[in-house]
């Protein structure tokens, strides 16, 4: 027997049933996708789909060459024809904005876009963190005021309500100011951290040289006292940045959205400015962040487009659905409405016709394949989770009737004329 080929570690199959190490099912995932489709339409966002492979330069320019994502986590390879460096996308914003610039979507109006799809990072797999993971992203492009900042926060809070997890999530916010303000803060931060360089761990020493703001994001408990006393970016904000942040907070207050100001919240990608935020939870162990985002007013220009102030956020679907499966509520119904079975010569063709007629009327019908006893077929109908069973045997064929059974017992088992099949099932379903 040939050796089985296993999936790549950290890249999961999505099956109709739960797996030992991956509890999410395809039906649960589909129910979430349906919820997201309704949610995004309610806020006027339109879907965009981009390739999973992009030129590596896109992420170097947008995310930042010195970031952990670009430096250590991307899957990068050369195209065999022209040696062009390509990468599997590690996040969705850069690809979305590349498409917007390439196709001139901001030519005459702002855009509200959303995406959903797989992303890839070469990380150590653990619960809620995988090498292939999926994101839902929201991008509001061409909007300058703090009102859109507050709107997308409210939008995300609305989704948490729909998923039944609002009480388990905490909103943290911060302002990173503009480029000049961050530069002034960076200089002060480097001067401060350099005094403690001998106490920094190796990762923080590296970040001190490449992206000192990320030192403040360390999870090392031995460095918390040093980081807590570090210069705060909020103290370097100018009047315009302060006003934007103050108006943003006032809008959150007006919407009744509670938040915590976290001056050490910086996000892991270089393109952020002004408003940044994260939704966190204490229910997933170390993987606390479920959703994060912020403003990236200079990114579209950085990618070759005309300047356009913008904001967005992304959520990791696997991590989010782990939270929903444990604490939330998501209506999942993968079972068919009807299980159609047959017994005897020519009954298989007739039940196929009945099943197709029911499907045209909106019923989900699973048709039995093969030839087994009615007892065996009824067992499969029960295992399928179908609410109703449709039986066509020799007596029904001869009399022009069908037998219907309510698997929940409410209507029992009845024989009805074939022409009344759809009407009867509709009555039972709506009762």
Swiss-Prot record:
GO annotation, biological process: histidyl-tRNA aminoacylation
InterPro entries named in the record: aa-tRNA-synth_II (IPR006195), aa-tRNA-synth_II/BPL/LPL (IPR045864), Anticodon-bd (IPR004154), Anticodon-bd_dom_sf (IPR036621), His-tRNA-ligase (IPR015807), HisRS-like_core (IPR041715), HisRS/HisZ (IPR004516), HisRS_anticodon (IPR033656)
One GO CC annotation: cytoplasm
Keyword terms: Aminoacyl-tRNA synthetase, ATP-binding, Cytoplasm, Ligase, Nucleotide-binding, Protein biosynthesis
Entry's localization field: Cytoplasm
Keyword Amino-acid biosynthesis included in the entry's annotation: no
Family annotation (Gene3D superfamilies): Anticodon-binding domain, Bira Bifunctional Protein, Domain 2
Superkingdom in the source lineage: Bacteria
MF terms (GO), sorted A to Z: ATP binding; histidine-tRNA ligase activity
Primary localisation category: cytoplasm
EC number: 6.1.1.21
Catalytic activity: tRNA(His) + L-histidine + ATP = L-histidyl-tRNA(His) + AMP + diphosphate + H(+)
Family listed: Belongs to the class-II aminoacyl-tRNA synthetase family.
Quaternary state and interactors: Homodimer.
Protein name as catalogued: Histidine--tRNA ligase
Origin species: Neisseria meningitidis serogroup C / serotype 2a (strain ATCC 700532 / DSM 15464 / FAM18)
């Amino acid at each position: 027997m040939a050796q089985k080929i296993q999936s790549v570690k950290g890249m999961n199959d999505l099956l109709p049933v739960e797996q030992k190490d991956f509890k999410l099912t395809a039906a649960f995932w589909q129910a979430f996708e349906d919820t997201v489709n309704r949610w995004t339409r309610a806020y006027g966002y339109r879907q965009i789909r981009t390739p999973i492979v992009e030129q590596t330069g896109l992420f170097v320019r947008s995310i930042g060459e010195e970031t952990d994502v670009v430096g250590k986590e991307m899957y990068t390879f050369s195209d065999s024809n022209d040696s062009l460096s390509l990468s599997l996308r590690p996040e969705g914003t850069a690809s979305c904005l590349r498409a917007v610039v390439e196709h001139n979507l901001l030519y005459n109006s702002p855009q509200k876009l959303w995406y959903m799809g797989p992303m890839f990072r070469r990380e150590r797999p653990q619960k809620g963190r995988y090498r292939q993971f999926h994101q839902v992203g929201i991008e509001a492009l061409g909007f300058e005021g703090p009102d859109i900042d507050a709107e997308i926060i409210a939008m995300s809070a609305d989704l948490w309500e729909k998923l039944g997890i609002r009480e388990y999530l905490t909103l943290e916010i911060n302002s990173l100011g503009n480029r000049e303000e961050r530069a002034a803060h960076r200089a002060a931060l480097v001067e401060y951290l350099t005094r403690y360089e001998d106490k920094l761990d190796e990762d923080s020493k590296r970040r001190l040289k490449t992206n000192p703001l990320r030192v403040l994001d360390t999870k090392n408990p031995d460095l918390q006292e040093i980081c807590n006393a570090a210069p705060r970016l909020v103290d370097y904000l100018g009047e315009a940045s302060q006003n934007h942040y103050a108006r943003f907070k006032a809008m959150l207050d007006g919407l009744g959205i509670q938040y915590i100001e976290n001056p050490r919240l910086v996000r892991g990608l270089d393109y952020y400015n002004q408003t940044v935020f994260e939704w966190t939870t204490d229910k997933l162990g170390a993987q606390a962040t479920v959703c994060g985002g912020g403003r990236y007013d200079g990114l579209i220009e950085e990618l070759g487009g005309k300047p356009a102030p913008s904001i967005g956020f992304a959520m990791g679907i696997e991590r989010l659905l782990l939270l929903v499966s444990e604490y939330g509520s998501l209506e999942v119904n993968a079972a068919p409405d009807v299980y159609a079975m047959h017994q005897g010569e020519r009954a298989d063709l007739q039940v196929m016709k009945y099943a197709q007629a029911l499907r045209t009327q909106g019923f989900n019908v699973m048709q039995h394949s093969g030839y087994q006893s009615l007892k065996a077929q009824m067992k499969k109908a029960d295992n399928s989770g179908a609410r109703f069973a449709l039986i066509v045997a020799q007596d029904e064929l001869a009399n022009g009737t069908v037998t219907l059974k309510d698997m929940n017992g409410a209507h029992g088992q009845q024989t009805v004329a074939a022409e009344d099949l759809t009407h009867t099932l509709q009555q039972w379903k709506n009762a």
